[in-house]
Amino acid sequence: MDQQRLTHLKQLEAESIHIIREVAAEFDNPVMMYSIGKDSSVMLHLARKAFYPGKIPFPLLHVDTDWKFREMIEFRDRTAEKYGFELLVHKNPEGIAMGCSPFVHGSSKHTDIMKTQGLKQALNKYGFDAAFGGARRDEEKSRAKERVYSFRDKNHTWDPKNQRPELWKTYNGQVNKGESIRVFPLSNWTELDIWQYIYLENIEIVPLYLADKRPVVERDGMLIMVDDDRMELQPGEVIEEKSVRFRTLGCYPLTGAIESEANTLTGIIEEMLVATSSERQGRAIDHDQSGSMELKKRQGYF
């Protein structure tokens, strides 16, 4: 395929499909992480394209923290039923038993128990030797220096100082028993690329990405949506109805919305063209050193 004849987005699409097919051919037991967000929706769309008209030859895995937005879970189940892929859902049973909550245990401990430890449990349980993730290099500085094929040892840890060289499109997938590779087919995409591709390919997304009137409270400089009756208000907090949307989606008490009137994909793209801040600015788990992304990734987080 002559890359020079392809548009920018078609070049990114071709690169991602090549990576997805390469992993499917090279590894014995791959899995695709499905976080239900916009990047996961694009990655799922690319996987469906990569193997069309056949089915996706590997399962999708959602590590459920029990604190995702209700609209996310509804969208997940509806999407799995619509496309007929194998969906695995894992919750950390120890975390559920202890009632792990971002309100009681804090963002760092909640993320470690329900996301990092939950992910490692699922990878061990099913014996996956490769796991696709939707992370992009433009999101955050530790992700910017990570390889497309990111090696993990038998404890699922990452050493950023000991990464394998990647020359052009030659990826090293050699692993010993118990080791694995995290694979990031969207590494070279930007947030704007994602939204333009969603628009052009008519990809379904969680409605929370589009602006609407929603109940929110202002906390630590973020607008937190009140998604269910588990939301614990702090003294002086008042629930307000505001027109907001989300640039990134995670556990609802730890994910900040932005005030916006962009209720269409074209409106979102117009906002992205003038945006000067990272989408992960709305993630509470990224705001303190103890919860930094690189530290979490070293411990096994995606």
Curated annotation (Swiss-Prot):
Residues 280-302 are annotated as: Disordered. Pathway: Sulfur metabolism; hydrogen sulfide biosynthesis; sulfite from sulfate: step 1/3. GO terms for molecular function: ATP binding; sulfate adenylyltransferase (ATP) activity. It catalyses: sulfate + ATP + H(+) = adenosine 5'-phosphosulfate + diphosphate. The keyword ATP-binding applies. The keyword Nucleotide-binding applies. Its EC number is 2.7.7.4. GO terms for biological process: hydrogen sulfide biosynthetic process; sulfate assimilation. InterPro entries: PAPS_reduct_dom, Rossmann-like_a/b/a_fold, SO4_adenylTrfase_ssu, Sulfate_adenylyltrnsfr_sub2. Keywords: ATP-binding, Nucleotide-binding, Nucleotidyltransferase, Transferase. It is an enzyme of class 2 (transferase). Signal peptide: none annotated. With CysN forms the ATP sulfurylase (ATPS) that catalyzes the adenylation of sulfate producing adenosine 5'-phosphosulfate (APS) and diphosphate, the first enzymatic step in sulfur assimilation pathway. APS synthesis involves the formation of a high-energy phosphoric-sulfuric acid anhydride bond driven by GTP hydrolysis by CysN coupled to ATP hydrolysis by CysD. Belongs to the PAPS reductase family. CysD subfamily. HAMAP family: Sulf_adenylyltr_sub2. Heterodimer composed of CysD, the smaller subunit, and CysN. This is Sulfate adenylyltransferase subunit 2. It comes from Vibrio parahaemolyticus serotype O3:K6 (strain RIMD 2210633). The gene is cysD.
